[in-house]
């Protein structure tokens, strides 16, 4: 009899332990705006990954290109200059050194489309979540979303004071500083300020000029004003500015071609047959610099059976770059300088 009581007691303890474990590990409901309306992740009929702010911090995601560390099937590729880079989802995407080539992975920040690649490379502001939609999304997001969408949602200004400063250092004299502050202005208005700097020395050497290349030198500022009225009206005004000024980019050969033999015949140095080389032989330092700015007004009005949303924005981008397009120490081709507004 005592034996059966002992077994019954153990069974009850085991059942209660399972219930307590289940209650303490409830799955948090994930909200996404992948279909332009707020729905739970289970209700969205598309393939989407949602990355929270905590996941971004833990993975040390600095900019949109780092998202490939936490999102399956998302890839990024760097081309000849800082701004000539591209996103690929499930292997699909457009990448080129041609400024006229439109991307097939659309990137939105708070509902505002970033059309130029150079406006996508700056560090992320204070983020609430990032949504990555896989597959064609042109019905809701336009013609440049045939491969997918990266949708970045930033934190709204808070009516409670909050400030945060974070710094990180790394090899090649890498220094990253991020600052964020938010506070109320009145019972119906709040603001936030966000500033980022990202600097690092180059990890490759130009043997002709003696200077480093592939360095990092970027700055960004963002100001946000939130107005909430008693009649379910929300107005959010955002202004942002960022700039970059870098020597980029290092190149390497996978195998020797006839053009390389021509460079050797002219007494020039060319990139070795090593895609991971830390040396380049440009007869001048290839550089890439630019700045981006924008302002947007987001109006949301809650009605009885619907929500009215209006997003109005204006963006401006300027860039200047010069590339040694023969990739060797000779002057076979003149410097290719591009100024894009």
Give the label of every model feature segment.
Residues 42-44, 143, 204, 248-250, ...:
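Short, solvent-exposed loop/turn and secondary-structure capping segments
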């Amino acid at each position: 009899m005592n034996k059966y009581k002992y077994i019954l007691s153990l069974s009850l303890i085991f059942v209660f332990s399972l219930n307590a474990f289940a209650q303490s590990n409830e799955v948090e409901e994930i909200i996404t705006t992948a279909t332009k309306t707020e729905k739970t992740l289970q209700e969205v009929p598309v393939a989407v990954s949602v990355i929270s702010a905590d996941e971004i911090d833990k993975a040390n995601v600095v900019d949109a290109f780092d998202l490939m560390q936490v999102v399956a099937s998302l890839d990024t590729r760097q081309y000849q200059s800082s701004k000539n880079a591209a996103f690929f989802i499930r292997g699909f995407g457009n990448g080129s050194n041609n400024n006229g080539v439109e991307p097939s992975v659309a990137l939105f920040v708070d509902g505002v489309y970033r059309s130029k690649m150079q406006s996508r490379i700056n560090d992320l502001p204070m983020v609430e979540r990032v949504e990555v939609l896989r597959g064609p999304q042109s019905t809701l997001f336009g013609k440049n979303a045939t491969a997918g969408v990266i949708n970045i949602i930033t934190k709204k200004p808070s009516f409670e004071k909050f400030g945060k400063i974070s710094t990180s250092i790394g090899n090649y004299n890498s220094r990253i500083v991020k600052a964020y502050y938010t506070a109320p202005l009145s019972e119906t208005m709040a603001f936030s300020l966000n500033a980022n700097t990202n600097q690092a020395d180059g990890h490759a050497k130009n043997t002709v000029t003696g200077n480093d290349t592939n360095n990092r030198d970027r700055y960004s500022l963002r100001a946000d004003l939130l107005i909430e009225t008693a009649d379910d009206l929300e107005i959010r005004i955002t202004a942002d500015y960022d700039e970059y000024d870098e020597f980029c980019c290092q190149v390497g050969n996978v195998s020797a071609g006839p053009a390389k033999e021509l460079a050797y015949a002219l007494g020039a140095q060319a990139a070795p047959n090593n895609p991971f080389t830390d040396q380049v032989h440009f007869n001048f330092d290839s550089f890439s610099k630019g700045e981006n700015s924008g302002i947007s007004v987001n109006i949301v009005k809650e009605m009885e059976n619907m929500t009215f949303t209006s997003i109005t924005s204006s963006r401006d981008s300027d860039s200047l770059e010069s590339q040694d397009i023969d990739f060797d120490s000779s002057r076979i081709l003149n410097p290719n300088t591009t100024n894009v507004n």
